[in-house]
């Protein structure tokens, strides 16, 4: 059926300050899309606003995008902790972005996993990495997905591998409202 994406980009920053009733109504408003997509991505900004947490906690799977920088670690840890404490989320998938190579990405993940596991009863799963590359940068500038323009390049193959890992990861058991009882990532 396809893939749908709700971007957390600049145009949606006003969603950060929604009241609880409006957030719940917004989550329910996606119900008609249930038959129109196989996977539904919700991209929330870094940090742990009430709106971001509502969307994360309503999702079957949570994907944390981590960069090997202190601010990224702090934002990711804050989101993991808040989603776990407030929403009972226990399983998180992690992709390392802008890594030099796979070895560096796994090292970055291990450092984050060690810290998070020390203080939180959560399970973090490494699903892959994306390199710091010209191809990805060009794709962003052109606003054309790399997996469409060059399906066989290294980055496209990494996306495919990450997708398989993510889809095979366990779903979280939500205690509250969820997105149309279908995979919301």
Regions found by a protein language model. Name each.
Residues 9, 29-36, 58, 82-86, ...:
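Conserved, well-folded catalytic cores of nucleic-acid-processing
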Residues 19-23, 45, 73-76, 159:
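A conditional alpha-helix N-cap/helix-loop micro-motif detector
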Residues 1-2, 8, 48, 130-134:
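Mobile beta-alpha loop/short-helix "lid" or hinge segments that flank ligand
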Residues 21, 107, 154-157:
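Conserved active-site and cofactor/substrate-binding residues in soluble primary-metabolism enzymes
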Residues 39, 44-128, 138:
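Conserved catalytic-core segment of NTP-binding enzymes
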Residues 1-35, 140-142:
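P-loop/Walker-type NTP enzyme "switch/lid" segment
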Residues 120-147, 159:
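Beta-strand-loop-alpha "switch" segments that mediate conformational coupling across diverse proteins
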Residues 141-185:
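NTP-binding/hydrolysis catalytic cores, primarily Walker-type P-loop NTPases
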């Amino acid at each position: 059926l396809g893939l749908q994406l709700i971007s957390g980009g600049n145009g949606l920053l006003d969603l950060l300050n929604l009241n609880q009733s409006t957030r719940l109504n917004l989550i329910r408003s996606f119900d008609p899309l249930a038959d129109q997509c196989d996977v539904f991505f919700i991209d929330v900004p870094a940090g742990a606003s009430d709106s971001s947490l509502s969307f994360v906690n309503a999702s079957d799977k949570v994907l944390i995008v981590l960069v090997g920088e202190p601010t990224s670690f702090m934002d990711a840890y804050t989101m993991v902790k808040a989603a776990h404490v407030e929403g009972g989320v226990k399983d998180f998938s992690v992709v390392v972005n802008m890594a030099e190579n796979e070895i560096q990405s796994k090292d970055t993940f291990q450092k984050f996993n060690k810290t998070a596991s020390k203080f939180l009863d959560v399970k973090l799963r490494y699903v892959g990495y994306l390199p710091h590359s010209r191809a990805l940068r060009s794709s962003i500038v052109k606003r054309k997905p790399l997996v469409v323009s060059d399906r066989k390049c290294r980055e496209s193959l990494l996306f495919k591998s990450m997708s398989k890992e993510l889809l095979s990861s366990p779903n979280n058991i939500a205690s509250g409202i969820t997105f149309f009882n279908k995979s919301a990532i």
